[in-house]
Amino acid sequence: MSPQTETKASVGFKAGVKDYKLTYYTPEYETKPTDILAAFRVTPQPGVPPEEAGAAVAAESSTGTWTTVWTDGLTSLDRYKGRCYHIEPVAGEESQFIAYVAYPLDLFEEGSVTNMFTSIVGNVFGFKALRALRLEDLRIPPAYSKTFQGPPHGIQVERDKLNKYGRPLLGCTIKPKLGLSAKNYGRAVYECLRGGLDFTKDDENVNSQPFMRWRDRFLFCAEAIFKSQAETGEIKGHYLNATAGTCEEMIKRAVFARELGVPIVMHDYLTGGFTANTSLAHYCRDNGLLLHIHRAMHAVIDRQKNHGMHFRVLAKALRLSGGDHIHAGTVVGKLEGEREITLGFVDLLRDDFVEKDRSRGIYFTQDWVSLPGVLPVASGGIHVWHMPALTEIFGDDSVLQFGGGTLGHPWGNAPGAVANRVALEACVQARNEGRDLAREGNEIIRAASKWSPELAAACEVWKEIKFEFPAMDTL
C-alpha cells in the first residue's frame, strides 16, 4: 500500500476494540412504529456490566463485530444498528436482567422468517461475554407482518370449509405412531372419524418409512375420509404429514394430497425449517388445502428458562410463516402460572390485537392487522375427564386432540371417538346454558355418561389418571 493510500484509509478511523455500550447502548432512544423489538433475558459472565452485555446482544445481532472496522465509514451505522434501549432486572434473579433491543426494519428481508431469525438469534447465543441468553418476546410491526402471507386460510375460512361452528374441533393422533401397515392405519382413521371426530392425525415422525410408505398411507387415509363422510354426513379430515427430506419431495406429497381431494396436510415446521414451511403454506393457500403444524423439537429450543427462545416467539414466527393449526400445550393439570403464559401465546396465535401484559408473559403490544389467526391445538395426555376444563380454557376456536384418550378406549377406536364427542357436546351445551364448567365439570360428564355407555366406559378407565408435575415454564 502506498503512503498516500494508507493516509486516506486511516482518516477518521481508529483501529482497535472498544466497548459495545459506547455505540449500541442508547437509553435515550425512542422506538419507532416500524422497529422490530426484542426482549432478551440476559445472564452475563461475572464482571460484565448489564449495559455492556445488553449492548453486545444488540451489536452482535445487527451490525457489530468484535473490533472496529474501517468499512463502518462506508455506511450509516446510526441508521442500521440495533440498539439496546432499556434494561430491567428480573425479579428473584440477581444475575439476570431483561434487555430490550430495537432493530431497524431495513435489516430484514421481506417475507422471510428465516432471515429474521438468522439476524436476531443466529449468532449471538454463542457469545462468550454471556453465560446464557433467552429471547422472551418479539414485537413484529405491521410494516413487516404485511410482507407475509401468513396462515393459508385462517380460523373463519376453515370453519366455513368444514361447516362446523360453535364448538371446538375434535382430533386424534393415530397410535401406535410407528409400525402399522398403511391399510391398518387407514382402518384406525376410519373408525375414529366414523365415531364422531372431525380430524385424525399422522404423528410428527410418520413420514415415509419401510413399514408404511407415504403414498400408500395417503391412499388408505383418503378412502377412510370419504367413507366416514358418506356415513356421517359431516366433513372429515386427516392430517397427512407432508414433511420430507427435501422441499421438492414435500411439495410432491402435498400435490398428491390435493389430487386425492383431502382437505388438510401437515408439516413439522421446526425440523422441516421455516423456508420449507413458508413454501408449503403458499402452496396450501393457492390450492385450497388447510395446513396443520406440529412443533416437534420445540422443547430443545424453549424448555430452559434462561437460554433459548420462548415458545411465544416460535408461535409468532409460525403465524408469519404460515399454518392453520399449531400444537400449543394443554394447561390441564399444571400450575396456574403456566396457564396464564399458555393462554398468552394462544391469544397471540388467534387474536388480531393483543395488549402488553407481563402477567401473561407478553412483553409488547402486538397488532397483527389483517394476518389470519391460527387454531391452537391442545394435545398430550388428555381424556374425557379433561373435557370441561379444556372447553373452558381454550374456548370454541381450538382443536382438542385425544390420541390415547380415543384409541385407548376398552371397546375400541369408534367407541373412544363417540365418548369424546358426547363429552364435548355435553360441555358445550352446559356452557351455553350458563353453567360453570370449571366448578361443575365432573358432574356434567357423569350426567352425560348415564345415557352414553361409551362415555361411561371411558370415565371408568381414566378416572384415576393424572399428570401432576411442576411446570417448567413460569414467569
Swiss-Prot record:
It is an enzyme of class 4 (lyase). RuBisCO catalyzes two reactions: the carboxylation of D-ribulose 1,5-bisphosphate, the primary event in carbon dioxide fixation, as well as the oxidative fragmentation of the pentose substrate in the photorespiration process. Both reactions occur simultaneously and in competition at the same active site. This is Ribulose bisphosphate carboxylase large chain. The record marks 334 as: Transition state stabilizer. The modification N6,N6,N6-trimethyllysine is found at residue 14. GO terms for cellular component: chloroplast. The basic functional RuBisCO is composed of a large chain homodimer in a 'head-to-tail' conformation. In form I RuBisCO this homodimer is arranged in a barrel-like tetramer with the small subunits forming a tetrameric 'cap' on each end of the 'barrel'. Substrate binds at residues 123, 173, 177, 295, 327, 379. The modification N-acetylproline is found at residue 3. The keyword Magnesium applies. Residues 1-2 form a propeptide. The active site is at 175 (proton acceptor), 294 (proton acceptor). Keywords: Acetylation, Calvin cycle, Carbon dioxide fixation, Chloroplast, Disulfide bond, Lyase, Magnesium, Metal-binding, Methylation, Monooxygenase, Oxidoreductase, Photorespiration, Photosynthesis, Plastid.
